[in-house]
Amino acid sequence: MPLHMIPQVAHAMVRAAATGRLTLYTKTRTETTNLDHAEYVTCGRYTICAFCLTTLAPHANVKTIQDSHACSRQPNEAIRSLVEVSDKAQIALVGSRTVDYHELDVKAGFVAPTADETVAPSKDIVELPFRTCDLDDSSATACVRNHCQAGHDGVTHLPILSGDFKLPNEHPTKPLDDTHPHDKVLTRCPKTGLLLVHDTHAHATAVVATAATRAILMHDLLTSANVDDGHQARSACYGPTFSNLTFACHSTCASDMAHFDCGQIVGIDLHVEPSD
């Protein structure tokens, strides 16, 4: 698969999961709902291998595919996570350019069991009082500049994950109601790295469909294409400003944001540590 197609495929897969349009097929090209029996995954625009993520066709007509690729045939956790989102409809992907903080409860229809890792206290969960930075300018450079100049006055800000995702807010310049500042927790799935927002009052969980979500899938796609995951490859995926974006944020915020190492975004290894 050409390198320039990787962002398109990853984006299409995430969008299809968000709208419940991922379809699984067995080796005999029969539709199935069991990922353990699936050989192919289609999202309407592409058909990919359910194991190694190789893009097999730029369409969803599985019956015409003549695949002869080398494959590890090892289950892929990123695909499994997306399929669970799409088929079981347990978690709502929140992927609009600006997420309405107060609509998270409506969009997240999954009631997590008490034993779920997104509910039980652990080192991967940190409570965040969501506030906004001045993000009238949604460009990647402006997002980092405004975020880094926010002051770090003890208020925990969501790290800027990419230029195409703003902080949850009612209005770009209006702070949120802080009556219950700790009713949202940010964590990540330990298997897939997907970022999760959990509402401690409604017991609802939402997957944040940011560019970081796509980045995890892109990383697997890069690996399957045997592309060196270096600056050149990442630049092709995220645009020429990606490395500068994360470097600038990491350099400015490293000492003040020990709770979340922005520099880890470069390695696609997102993690959250407890705040003091």
From Swiss-Prot:
It is found in: Virion. GO terms for cellular component: T=13 icosahedral viral capsid; viral outer capsid. Transmembrane segments: none annotated. Its main location: virion. Keywords: Capsid protein, Outer capsid protein, T=13 icosahedral capsid protein, Virion. Disulfide bonds: none annotated. InterPro entries: Capsid_VP7. Interacts with VP4 and VP6. Belongs to the aquareoviridae outer capsid VP7 protein family. Interacts with VP4 to form the outer icosahedral capsid with an incomplete T=13 symmetry, about 80 nm in diameter, and consisting of 200 VP4-VP7 trimers. This is Outer capsid protein VP7. It comes from Aquareovirus C (isolate Golden shiner/USA/GSRV/1977) (AQRV-C). The lineage of its organism: Viruses, Riboviria, Orthornavirae, Duplornaviricota, Resentoviricetes. The gene is S10.
